[in-house]
Amino acid sequence: MIGQIKVLGKSKEEAEAEALKQLEAVGLADRADFKPGALSGGQQQRVAIARAVAMHPNVLLFDEPTSALDPELVRGVLDVMRDLAKNSGMTMIVVTHEMGFAKDVADRVVFMEGGVVVEQGTPDVIFNNPQNPRTAEFIGAIA
């Protein structure tokens, strides 16, 4: 809430209401009073997303948001991100190895290797008709 108060100039009451609204959106309103250590990794990630969204950014960056999670927790985080992509109108830049998620949610996919862009295009092109042999090799390996 401090970011909303200090940066956005909201009152404590407005910040609390926005925080609760965003926790509700990620399915964690019932955990509003919990300390981070009392939350699972997936819940912590969803709280982090709620905190970021509460600041009403135009662009939200995600760097491997599911990489440190147990497999059973990944879906909850991806569901929150999928909902944001569909309903927020916010630009999201996501670094991920979750190819199914990228294929379903992205407007544009950039395939990189060694910090270099290998190929970029629509999900249809990248996943179904890659133009670069390295992209094709990667897609073939995960199919």
Where are each of the predicted segments found?
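Conserved ABC ATPase signature
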Residues: 35-39, 43
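Conserved catalytic motifs of ABC-family nucleotide-binding domains
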Residues: 56
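Catalytic Walker B motif of ABC-type/P-loop ATPase nucleotide-binding domains
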Residues: 60-63
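Helical segment within the ABC ATPase nucleotide-binding domain
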Residues: 75-87
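H-loop/switch region of ABC-family ATPase nucleotide-binding domains
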Residues: 96-97
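ABC ATPase "signature
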Residues: 120-121
